[in-house]
């Protein structure tokens, strides 16, 4: 009987996740030259006429690459579907999906994730070229608040988060890179963006030094930056980051001056 009850609970829980993910509209952006990018869109639950809403760009990790337009919701989407968050923090939320052969900020996977060995001269990747076009279409919408554009990502997506803020610091009010890395010499360009960085000190995939050095570089540049390091946590620090009690409030409190 207990096993049956556990199965029923699990079944309805999974059903709820699938149903919730269906609230993210399936979209495909196609450029004039024919390049495309899959993405999912969550709209504010209630859109008031004349109201402007923040826009959040969420960049997934390497494990969620593909072409199914679903895997990118595996981490992070439930946070946005939480009824309390839906009510208190209405926003347009974009979850693009990086192609299997792509790597968000880079044309190929960096040979080392140690910050001093990360590329310092980074050409715009094909995936980010299309993503920037997609982002521009939403920035042109009158219901999007241009002063409250946020970006966050985990692992490969955190590397993309750093890269986007370096290239387009004028766009983003705040950024949350989780267990990422970047060449710290590039970060001076992003000093006007407010950062909140997370990492686990036992991460064996992306060394924690990536976040430590990013924090130091941003701090030295005069940026508004906060760093949280989780003791004993490996390459899953997003699970703890998403449950920080002030996670949403901090993000949605940020606004471009």
Residue ranges and their predicted role:
Residues 62-128:
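Active-site machinery of serine-nucleophile hydrolases
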Residues 136-191:
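Primarily recognizes the serine-hydrolase "nucleophile elbow" in alpha/beta-hydrolase
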Residues 74-84, 179-187, 209, 213:
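Alpha-helical scaffolding within the catalytic cores
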Residues 1-23:
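Bacterial Sec-dependent N-terminal signal peptides
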């Amino acid at each position: 009987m207990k096993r049956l009850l556990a199965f029923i609970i699990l079944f309805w829980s999974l059903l709820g996740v699938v149903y919730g993910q269906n609230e993210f509209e399936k979209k495909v952006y196609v450029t004039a030259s024919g390049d495309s990018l899959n993405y999912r869109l969550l709209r504010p639950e209630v859109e008031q006429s004349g109201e402007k809403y923040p826009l959040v760009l969420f960049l997934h990790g390497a494990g969620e690459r593909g072409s199914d337009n679903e895997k990118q919701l595996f981490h992070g989407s439930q946070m946005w579907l939480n009824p309390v968050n839906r009510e208190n923090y209405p926003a347009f939320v974009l979850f693009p999906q990086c192609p299997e052969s792509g790597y968000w900020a880079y044309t190929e996977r960096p040979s080392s994730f140690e910050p001093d060995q990360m590329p310092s001269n980074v050409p715009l990747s094909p995936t980010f070229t299309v993503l920037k076009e997609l982002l521009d279409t939403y920035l042109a919408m009158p219901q999007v608040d241009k002063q409250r554009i946020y970006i966050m990502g985990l692992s490969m997506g955190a590397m993309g988060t750093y890269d986007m803020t370096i290239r387009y610091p004028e766009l983003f009010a705040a950024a949350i890179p989780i267990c990422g890395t970047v060449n710290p010499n590039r970060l001076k360009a992003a000093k006007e963006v407010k950062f909140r960085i997370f990492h686990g000190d036992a991460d064996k995939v992306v060394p924690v030094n990536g976040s430590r050095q990013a924090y130091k570089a941003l701090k030295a540049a005069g940026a508004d930056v906060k760093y949280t390091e989780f003791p004993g946590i490996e390459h899953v620090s997003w699970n703890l980051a998403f449950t920080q009690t002030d996670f949403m409030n901090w993000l949605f409190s940020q606004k471009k001056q």
